[in-house]
C-alpha cells in the first residue's frame, strides 16, 4: 500500500535529527537538559531556599544584567560549603546584587565577617534591603572599587596573612590569575578559594569557531589559561565542579 502524504511527512520528520538545546555557547546552565536542571531546582533547591534568598533572586531576575547572578543551585552549594568548613572570616570579589553574598552571610556565625568588593555599589544596593531584613548586614564590609588595591593593602600587613577561611571570586575573568596570587597569601593553609565560571558556559570545551556570544568569546581564553595555571599550582588541591557555570575549589596546602 502506498503511504499517504501525512505518513511520508511524519517519517521525514522522524528521520531528521532533533534540535539540540543550548547549541550556542552562552547558556547559563551547563546541563544539556533544561528539564533535568529544572528538576534539580524544584526538587532540591527551591524547597530549601531561605526566604531572603528567594526574594533576592526574584529581584535580580528583573535586572537587565541578571545573567551575572549566581545560580540558585550554586548558592545552595556555597552555603553548605561554608558550614562544612566552619568558615568565619571570608572574602568575596564580585558581588552584583548580592545573591552569593547573602548565601555566605547566612552560613556564617553571628560574629562572622565577609570583606565584599565590587566596582558597582548601585547593583549591591538593589539587594541590600533584603540582606538587612535577613539580619546579616552586620557581617558584611562592602568596599566599592577594584579589588586588587584592597588585597594589596591587606597583604602589606603581615597579620592578615593566612587570616581568611574562605574566598569566593566571581568577577573579571582576565584578573583571576592576579586575584589568585594575592588570595593564596591571605587564605589560611587548609582554607578554600572558590573561583566561579571556570567552565565558562561550556566554551572551554568548544571549538574556537563555535557560535558564541561576544562576551563569552572575549573571556574564553582567559578562563582556559587560568584553568591550566591553577591545575599546575602545587600550593593547592583543586576540584572543578559543573555546578552553575562551573566552580573550581582550591584548598591551600602550602
Swiss-Prot record:
Q: Which reaction does it catalyse?
A: (E)-caffeoyl-CoA + S-adenosyl-L-methionine = (E)-feruloyl-CoA + S-adenosyl-L-homocysteine + H(+)
Pathway assigned in UniProt: Aromatic compound metabolism; phenylpropanoid biosynthesis
Q: What residues bind a divalent metal cation, as annotated? A: 170, 196-197
Binding residue positions for substrate = 28, 170, 201
According to the record, what induces this protein's expression? Answer: By salt stress.
The role this protein plays is: Methylates caffeoyl-CoA to feruloyl-CoA and 5-hydroxyferuloyl-CoA to sinapoyl-CoA. Plays a role in the synthesis of feruloylated polysaccharides. Involved in the reinforcement of the plant cell wall. Also involved in the responding to wounding or pathogen challenge by the increased formation of cell wall-bound ferulic acid polymers.
Q: Which cysteines are joined by disulfide bonds?
A: none
Per the UniProt entry, what species is this protein from, by scientific name?
A: Mesembryanthemum crystallinum (Common ice plant)
* Family the entry assigns: Belongs to the class I-like SAM-binding methyltransferase superfamily. Cation-dependent O-methyltransferase family. CCoAMT subfamily.
Which residues does the record give as S-adenosyl-L-methionine binding sites?
Answer: 70, 92, 94-95, 100, 118, 147, 172
What is the residue range of the signal peptide feature? none
Q: Name one GO molecular function term.
A: caffeoyl-CoA O-methyltransferase activity
Designated name of the protein: Caffeoyl-CoA O-methyltransferase
The record's Pfam families line, in alphabetical order, gives: Methyltransf_3
EC numbers: 2.1.1.104
The entry's free-text remark on the cofactor is: Binds 1 divalent metal cation per subunit.
Cofactor names from the entry are: a divalent metal cation
Record keywords: Lignin biosynthesis, Metal-binding, Methyltransferase, S-adenosyl-L-methionine, Stress response, Transferase
List where Basic and acidic residues composition bias occurs: 7-25
> What are the GO BP annotations of this UniProt entry?
lignin biosynthetic process; methylation
From the UniProt entry, list the residue stretches annotated as the region Disordered. Answer: 1-25
Amino acid at each position: 500500500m502506498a503511504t499517504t502524504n501525512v505518513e511520508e511527512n511524519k517519517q521525514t520528520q522522524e528521520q531528521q535529527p532533533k534540535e539540540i538545546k543550548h547549541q550556542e555557547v552562552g547558556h547559563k546552565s551547563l546541563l544539556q537538559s533544561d528539564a533535568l536542571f529544572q528538576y534539580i531546582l524544584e526538587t532540591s533547591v527551591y524547597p530549601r531556599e531561605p526566604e531572603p534568598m528567594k526574594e533576592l533572586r526574584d529581584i535580580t531576575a528583573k535586572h537587565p544584567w541578571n545573567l551575572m547572578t549566581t545560580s540558585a543551585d550554586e548558592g545552595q552549594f556555597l552555603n553548605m560549603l561554608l558550614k562544612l568548613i566552619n568558615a568565619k572570616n571570608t572574602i568575596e570579589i564580585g558581588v552584583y546584587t548580592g545573591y552569593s553574598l547573602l548565601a555566605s552571610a547566612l552560613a556564617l556565625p553571628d560574629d562572622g565577617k565577609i570583606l565584599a568588593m565590587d566596582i558597582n555599589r548601585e547593583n549591591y544596593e538593589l539587594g541590600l534591603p533584603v540582606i538587612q531584613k535577613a539580619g546579616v548586614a552586620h557581617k558584611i564590609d562592602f568596599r566599592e572599587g577594584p579589588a586588587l588595591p584592597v588585597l594589596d593593602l591587606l597583604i602589606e600587613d603581615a597579620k592578615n596573612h593566612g587570616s581568611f577561611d574562605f574566598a569566593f571570586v566571581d568577577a573579571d575573568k582576565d584578573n583571576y590569575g592576579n586575584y589568585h596570587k594575592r588570595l593564596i597569601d591571605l587564605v589560611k593553609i587548609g582554607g578554600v578559594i572558590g573561583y566561579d565560571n571556570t567552565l565558562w558556559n561550556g566554551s572551554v570545551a568548544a571549538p574556537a569557531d563555535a557560535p558564541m556570544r561576544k562576551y563569552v568569546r572575549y573571556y574564553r581564553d582567559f578562563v582556559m589559561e587560568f584553568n591550566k595555571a591553577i591545575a599546575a599550582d602545587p600550593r593547592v588541591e583543586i576540584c572543578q565542579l559543573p555546578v552553575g557555570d562551573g566552580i573550581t575549589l582550591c584548598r591551600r596546602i602550602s
